[in-house]
Amino acid sequence: MKRYVRVSSQVCAWSLAVGALIFLTAADLFAQGRGFNGLDMDLANLPRLSNAQTRSISPENFTGEKGKAGMATEGTGKNAARDLGQGWKISPSVRIPAKSTFTMGEINGSGAIQQIWMTPAPLDKTQLYILRFYWDGETSPSVEVPMSHFFACGWGKYAQINSLAVCVNPGSAFNCYWPMPFRKSAKVTMENLDDKDMTLYYQINYTLTDVPQSMAYFHAQYRRESPLKTKGLYTILDGVQGRGQFVGTYLAWEVHSPGWWGEGEIKFYIDGDKEFPTICGTGTEDYFCGSYNFENHETKKYQTFSTPYTGLAQVLPPDEIYKVGQRFGLYRWHITDPVRFDKDLRVTIQALGWQSGGRYLQEEDDIASTAYWYQTEPHGAFPKLPGVDALKVGPLQVQN
């Protein structure tokens, strides 16, 4: 009996050793990238190998197929390449006719869009170029936003944006780094609502890979009220049903009263909140991670800034302060602090200034917004996009 116990103990120890070896080997294989899907890329995991496949859609490869780029014999660069021929920048861009929709790219399979670059012409009509994204064959887009507002540059004029999620670079280069996973398909379109043709250079960089069930779908929605329908109150987002997380806000704000305009609080109504929200800010500039009116105490002017997570990237005109008619572009990305919800979400912001006697003033400003969030599908219906006249940016008129 003692010998049997001794042998059994040896077998048990041997089994544990083998099990540990198998575990360590599996862990090592995983560390080498065998279990990595190529998503969630950052500086720390760049050395990790994966089975993901990199693809790219552009006017030089409309399908993104392997080995099919740079083959065009017709395109916007044909005349410039007439002495060089195929392979020499024959199709670097597309012309999108007035009042038409162009499919920028269609992807089949599972994966994620990881970066988008585009540059339009003309720049001052970008509020009339509508971006739409569709996931997994849906007929109602998950993204429907004017191009300029999607890239946090909504006043039809160039503004440098130096953020993690969006970059706007010289001279009119719009870049997006929001991860956009899909499981069956993805489609990206551009509608030209202008009465003139537009030129678009673009590239959609994506990966084909497995997408875990824990990943939700990217959404973005545009709204505008001019003037505000409810004095002093603007709704950034409502009607969201499902589970997800709110990840960003862009506001294009035109002031219609003199003085400081940003005392209003942003409020997040989460999972059934009615009269009172779960999250309430302390002021507009506070939400955008500034303070005390964004004022530079030396110049006595608004101080623009653009950082990885937040910015006041546009002040028009830049050399005035507290004037009626001034315009502002502000962004706030919740990359490290997403606002999570399990059932529903509503987001509002107050338009609040000052009047005599140290009293708050409910403003009647012109506010346009883009809300960015991830959620499970299906998503709720979006509000109807404003008409062309409501999308246009009128001339800047500042009152002294």
Predicted regions and their residues:
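Initiator methionine at the very start of the polypeptide chain
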Residues: 1-2, 31-32
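Bacterial N-terminal signal peptides that target proteins for export
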Residues: 2-16
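Bacterial N-terminal signal peptides
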Residues: 12-28
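Beta-strand-centric surfaces of beta-sandwich/beta-rich domains
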Residues: 32-400
